[in-house]
From Swiss-Prot:
CDD domains, per the entry: Urease_beta
Protein name: Urease subunit beta
UniProt-listed Enzyme Commission number(s): 3.5.1.5
Keyword Manganese: no
Places the protein is found: Cytoplasm
Complex and partners: Heterotrimer of UreA (gamma), UreB (beta) and UreC (alpha) subunits. Three heterotrimers associate to form the active enzyme.
Keyword Cytoplasm among UniProt keywords: yes
Organism: Parasynechococcus marenigrum (strain WH8102)
Annotated GO MF terms: urease activity
InterPro entries in the record: Urease_beta-like (IPR002019), Urease_betasu_sf (IPR036461), Urease_subunit (IPR050069)
Database matches in SUPFAM superfamilies: Urease, beta-subunit (SSF51278)
PANTHER family: UREASE (PTHR33569:SF1)
HAMAP family: Urease_beta
GO cellular component, one term: urease complex
Amino acid sequence: MAPLIPGELLPEPGELELNAGRPVTTLSVANSGDRPVQVGSHFHFAEANAALQFDRTAARGQRLDIPAGTAIRFEPGDSRDVNLIPFAGNRRVIGFNGQINGPLDA
């Protein structure tokens, strides 16, 4: 067996399917602003920048269905469909733009 290298990653062979089996909501999003808007993987999408136009009610309690630590950037005038998945765990949303600051299912 080869010696271990500090910090080395030893992934299992094959592919990982992110968020397997989670319900997906697809929404059309448009940036109506004059500056780019970037939204991170775990941001409560309903509270995203006001320049983004989309169904915020449908986005309540959801985040982007993208790998953790990544983001989607919307350039001015850009429009695209995004996939959202529900927050899991205890489903408490604290911070962001302060619109919820508590349980999503209350």
